């Protein structure tokens, strides 16, 4: 039996220690508990321990959970989002971390307009250069800046920052250049697009979140360290 309470306490302590090592306030870091494959009762147990931010990777799976759980949960879409599922995502999620193309932003904007809401989004950036990763390539700054300029014309989508996925590495230190690269990109974009409040850097998961926090993460996406290995559907 996984002891979620003990695991969560350890994660919170590690978040605080990582922030304090670099002179940051731990309160600047939002813990998003990633609940892919975990059932509503597990999420409810975490909710009762004080968690309010939960992340899902798939629209279909989230659809079976969101309505079963308290309304004051903030739901984060942290997985790749297909454009054809944008309407459902607008109904389920409070923020999308994985906007990696203008077409998706346009569809989110359209469905948000129909529902009278504005969706906070993060732009996913492929910092590592791995072909298996989604995201705007960090090396193609012109394409990224053109995309940002276009997304900024959409009234029902609000850019709030950047997200990246680090490569799977044996030593978390090997992920540091990826996290640093995203932070440096954010700083450059803040100069280029001062009208955007670049509030968030969503980066860092179970194996590397402490390094991500040291490099400026404001959102960490953690599943296994809290809930243990993923269950089977």
Task: Describe the predicted segments one by one.
Residues 217-233:
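Gly/Pro- and small hydrophobic-enriched strand-loop and loop-to-helix capping segments
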